[in-house]
Amino acid sequence: MLRPPSRSFGVAVSTPPRLRRDAQANLQKLRAAAIAVFSQRGLSAPLEDIAREAGVSIGTLYNRVGSREELIDAVVPDIAGAKLKTLRDRTLSQDSPRSQLETFIAEMIDLQRSDPAMNDAMLRRYPDAVLLINACERSMALGAELVANAHSAGVLAEDFTTDDLMAVLWLAGMASHDPAAPEGWRHVVDRSVSAAWLA
């Protein structure tokens, strides 16, 4: 089985040795602000807003963290780690291949709908944020394993593949944060999965 998202995510910011106390304080403020702003507005939130939330200048932000991707990776454990572990644990607590895959899909869609940052992560909008992509790939690997298990159990149509699972989650991620998306998008997603079950 897939191991839970690692707790050993490194802070990807460039932190000089013996950082001055005020610089350390600024770095902690930036991390806290990034967690808050990214979670509320997604990973594309203006860095100026994060600097403002932290009470520092945008120059200080760039000096301390370097880039958006480095800042994203610095807060991966707080944004994604615990949530993806919870998703994994709830999924694997189910007692059948079908219920595991159903739970995985439902939990993933709920996470995408409720958390703009996680939705951006699952849609891989920042592929250079290496730690974030790695965390998401571990969850997608779990999804692929669940599809294979459902095939082996004879409960899922063979022509419903991992690519179909990714397409379902992509559609949910795009539609859930698009004000122009048709109101019935979730029904379409659910129906596309329901049609693939054999038992």
Give the label of every model feature segment:
Residues 74, 85-114, 128:
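Hydrophobic alpha-helical connector segments
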